[in-house]
């Protein structure tokens, strides 16, 4: 019975880490949408017409960057090794740091509300997600996984 309880607790911890990274990814998407709307609004206010500010490459970049945020959430769910959890921690932390740094830079250029949105929507959930990933990484034995054949 104890093994079953340990297995369920480890599974719950992995799911909690994945959920926290998804909350952080959602916050990043909200921040990016607010930043884009603010940028377009400033372009319209300054010139009276909306120029084509985003080309096809910029839109692809936005889609790819928003899609990369799913990787830190998926790794703890599908992998049983600590290397995957470490990769989730490192990639997620890197994404949080770069998004917040970009948000602070854009906040200096476009207004304080952009920086505040980056801090509230990305940094705050990112700290909790990184902390949960670190705790999961420090667990002495984490045998639970959702896919038994995973070799990551």
Segments (PLM) and residue ranges:
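Juxtamembrane loop-transmembrane helix junctions in multi-pass integral membrane proteins
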Residues: 5-15, 49-56, 76-86, 109-116
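Hydrophobic transmembrane helix segments
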Residues: 23-64
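Juxtamembrane helix-break-helix junctions at the cytosolic face
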Residues: 66-93
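Membrane-water interface at the C-terminal end of transmembrane alpha helices
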Residues: 123-147
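Membrane-helix boundary connector in multi-pass membrane proteins
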Residues: 97-118
């Amino acid at each position: 019975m104890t093994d079953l309880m340990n297995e369920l607790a480890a599974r719950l911890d992995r799911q909690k880490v994945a959920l926290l990274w998804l909350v952080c990814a959602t916050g990043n998407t909200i921040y990016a949408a607010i930043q884009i709307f603010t940028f377009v609004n400033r372009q319209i206010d300054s010139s009276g017409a909306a120029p084509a500010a985003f080309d096809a490459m910029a839109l692809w970049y936005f889609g790819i960057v928003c899609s990369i945020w799913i990787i830190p959430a998926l790794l703890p769910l599908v992998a049983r090794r600590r290397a995957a959890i470490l990769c989730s921690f490192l990639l997620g932390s890197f994404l949080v740091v770069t998004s917040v740094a970009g948000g602070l830079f854009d906040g200096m250029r476009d207004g304080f509300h952009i920086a505040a949105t980056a801090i509230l929507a990305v940094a705050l959930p990112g700290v909790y997600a990184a902390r949960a990933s670190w705790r999961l990484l420090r667990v002495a034995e984490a045998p639970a996984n959702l896919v038994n054949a995973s070799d990551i």
